[in-house]
From Swiss-Prot:
Signal peptide: none annotated. Pfam families: DUF5421. Belongs to the chlamydial CPn_0705/CT_671/TC_0042 family. Disulfide bonds: none annotated. Residues 14-34, 42-53, 61-71 have a biased composition (Basic and acidic residues). Residues 1-99, 255-283 are annotated as: Disordered. It comes from the Bacteria. Residues 1-10 have a biased composition (Polar residues). This is Uncharacterized protein CT_671.
Length: 283
């Protein structure tokens, strides 16, 4: 009996060892990892696992489903990009190619109209009628020229109530050179008119003073006044020097010296630069 028990126990032990062990349900990583090769092919960890033997059919079905989803997403993205490109091309090359330009032309027209309106308003605010009246009432003809760097203006005075009878029909010539200006009356009708004009100028020294002062206010110095062939003596106006005038003169003097020094340095620098170029050319 004891032998039978031991044999049965040994037999049962062999049977237990021969039974295959059931596989335990281990946790699985469901994350998808793609591996890209240099040849442009991509594969997932699930696809590699499916190629290995001993895998279940459920894993294969899940991998196929994921591949189909990825392909569907890629095709959808490509189709959406093509639709956007077709829409963009259609806007510029479609049935109405000038539809985009209309949006730009409308505000530009408004801006141009506004500019025209503002310019007309600024011009209308300045009253230039007095200039027209002065020219038409005193000037018969006008000549403006530039001769040898001198600005020349020649006016033929008209016969009107605003011009004295002694100067009607005479020529008034203004020649400006820098800050100096000369005035001459010529081309009188006869000698009597010339004599009358000369006496009229010489007998009114106050008007000569006001003429010189008004020209100085415009940074012009009257150097000569000639009536016919007679040079009229000009009044001398003393310059009133104030501390402000002295300061301004000092500043102008320093500015002139600085400009001269700057020009000298620039000339020296240019000379050195040219010498270097000559040396480089010789080398």
């Amino acid at each position: 009996m004891e032998l039978n028990k031991t044999s049965e126990s040994l037999f049962s032990a062999k049977i237990d060892h021969n039974h295959p062990r059931t596989e335990a349900h281990e946790p699985r990583d469901q994350r998808e990892v793609r591996v890209f090769s240099l040849e442009g092919r991509s594969s997932t960890r699930q696809e590699k696992a499916d190629r290995m033997p001993g895998r279940t059919s459920s894993r294969q079905e899940s991998s196929k489903g994921s591949e189909e989803g990825a392909v569907h997403e890629s095709t959808a993205g490509v189709s959406s990009k093509e639709e956007e490109e077709s829409k963009g091309d259609g806007f510029f090359t479609g049935g109405n190619p000038t539809s985009g330009m209309a949006l730009v032309e409308t505000p530009m027209a408004v801006v141009s109209e506004a500019m025209v309106e503002t310019s007309t308003m600024t011009v209308s605010q300045v009253d230039l009628q007095w200039v027209e009246q002065l020219v038409t009432s005193t000037v018969e003809s006008l000549l403006v020229a530039d001769i040898d760097g001198k600005q020349l203006v020649e006016i033929v005075l008209d016969n009107s109530n605003t011009v004295p009878a002694a100067f009607c029909g005479a020529n008034l010539t203004l020649v400006q050179t820098g800050e100096e200006i000369s005035v001459s009356f010529s081309n009188f009708v006869d000698q009597a008119q010339l004599t009358e004009a000369t006496q009229l100028v010489q007998q009114n020294p106050k008007q000569l003073v006001s003429l010189v002062e008004s020209l100085k206010a415009r940074q012009l110095n009257l150097t000569e006044l000639v009536v016919g062939n007679v040079a009229v003596s000009l009044p001398t106006i003393e310059k009133i020097e104030t501390p402000l005038h002295m300061i301004a003169a000092t500043i102008r003097h320093h500015d002139q010296e600085g400009d001269q020094e700057g020009e000298g340095r620039q000339d020296q620098h240019q000379g050195q630069h040219q010498e270097k170029k000559v040396e480089e050319a010789h080398i």
